[in-house]
Structure formats: C-alpha cells, structure tokens
C-alpha cells in the first residue's frame, strides 16, 4: 500500500527480492517498527533532512537464487525467491493532499479503479502530464513546502501471498522508481517512506508480513 505525492509523473515498478539470511532480529524479536511520519511537525517530503524512513541502503542490483544453475540463467523470473507485483493495482486519485481516501491502508479496499503497474497515472486518464527541466511547475515557490491546493496524490493497493518456504527469510520489497515521494504500509502498518523519482528504493518488510494474504 502506498500513497504518492508528486509534481511530475509517476513510474512505478515493484517486485519482491529475497536476500539470503534470517529475518532481522533484535534480542530475538523482529526489528523495530519505524514510527509513522504523523509525529513530525511537517510531512517528510517537506523536510530536507529526510530522504527516506526505514529505507535500505542503496546497492548494486542483485538477485538471490537457490541453485547455481538457476543463477546462470541470468533471469530473475527463474528464481523461486522472486515475485513480481507488476500488473493491476487498485487505485484512487486526488488532485491535492488531504482529499485522498483516509486510512485506506487499514483494510482491503473495494470499488476502486484499476491501474496497470508499471505506468504513469497521467497516461491512464488522471491529471495531466507536466514536464519542467529548469523551473518549478508551480507558484509560489516556498521551500521546503509544497503546494496544497494542487498537487496530485495517488493511493495504490494490492494483495499478495508469500510462499510458505520463504518463512524465516529476509524479504525485501523493491520499487524500481516512484515520483516523487511515497509512503508504504504493509497490512495496515507504516513500513517506510522514500523519495528520489528515478532511483530504486528497497525496504525489509519481513516484520510486517503474515501468513496468507498480505496487503500493500
């Protein structure tokens, strides 16, 4: 589940990538759940000191395989440790922050439109494309604050099931690129935040997963 605040266009690719190893533990308990950004005096995308919350450090692209033969195919889809979440997602759009569905991440939604992932929502009939290479696409400019009267927000949701043989493994959620900032919830729990439209971002979501259906 993620909520995206954007200025320009959205491009989102997401898939699971398993890292070899046990789930992160602290004193034999799951790694601490980060504090939701609602405690901040302002949103994280208006704080220049924050570029991510609970976001893994950037790294080279790599995938985990169960056997050498699988790895030699150089095809991530041949790995039993990979699930693609590309495809249709439930989607709701609002023209400005505050108008999006409230607390939608707490339960499974119904009646929402469908949107393909990856895609730009502007190319799917929502809002209009904006491209500016040198100046801000809005006025007035008052850093670090962003416009509140017009600044499109997209809410996405998708259900998925984790294979039983992934138990006790670290599970990483990878976003290929999201413009320009987004928050992530797994099963109703805040799991992270990231910026950087054209860079991938990853989160260890192991502590938030449950048996059976999961909701992002």
Q: Each PLM stretch: what is its role?
A:
Residues 27-36, 41-44, 49-52, 75-76, ...:
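Accessory beta-strand-rich segments of carbohydrate-active enzymes
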Residues 108-110, 114-118, 138-141, 181-183, ...:
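Glycine-rich loops and low-complexity Gly/Arg-rich segments
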Residues 1-27:
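Bacterial Sec-dependent N-terminal signal peptides
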Residues 135-145, 150:
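Short glycine/proline-rich turn/loop motifs
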Residues 6-9, 13-14, 102, 136, ...:
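Short non-domain terminal segments
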Residues 20, 86, 109-110, 157, ...:
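A generic alpha-helix preference that emphasizes hydrophobic side chains
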Residues 24-137, 215:
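Accessory carbohydrate-binding/adhesion or oligomerization-edge regions at the termini
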């Amino acid at each position: 589940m993620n909520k995206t605040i954007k200025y320009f266009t959205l491009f989102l690719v997401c898939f699971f990538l398993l890292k070899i190893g046990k789930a992160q533990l602290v004193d034999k308990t799951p790694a601490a759940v980060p504090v939701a950004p609602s405690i901040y005096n302002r949103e994280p995308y208006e704080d220049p000191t924050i570029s991510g919350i609970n976001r893994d450090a950037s790294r080279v692209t790599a995938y985990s395989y169960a056997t050498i033969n699988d790895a030699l195919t150089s095809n991530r889809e041949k790995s039993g440790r990979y699930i693609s979440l590309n495809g249709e997602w439930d989607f709701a759009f609002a023209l400005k922050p505050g108008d999006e569905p409230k607390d939608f991440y707490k339960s499974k939604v119904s009646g929402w439109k469908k949107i393909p992932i990856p895609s730009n929502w502007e190319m799917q009939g929502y809002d209009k494309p904006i491209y500016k290479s040198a100046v801000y696409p809005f006025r007035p400019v008052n850093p670090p604050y962003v416009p509140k009267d017009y600044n499109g927000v997209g809410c996405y949701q998708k259900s998925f099931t984790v294979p039983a043989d992934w138990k006790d493994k670290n599970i990483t959620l990878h976003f290929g690129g999201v413009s320009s900032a987004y928050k992530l919830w797994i099963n109703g729990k805040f799991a992270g935040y990231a910026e950087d439209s054209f860079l991938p971002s990853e989160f260890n979501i192991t502590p938030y997963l449950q048996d059976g259906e999961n909701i992002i």
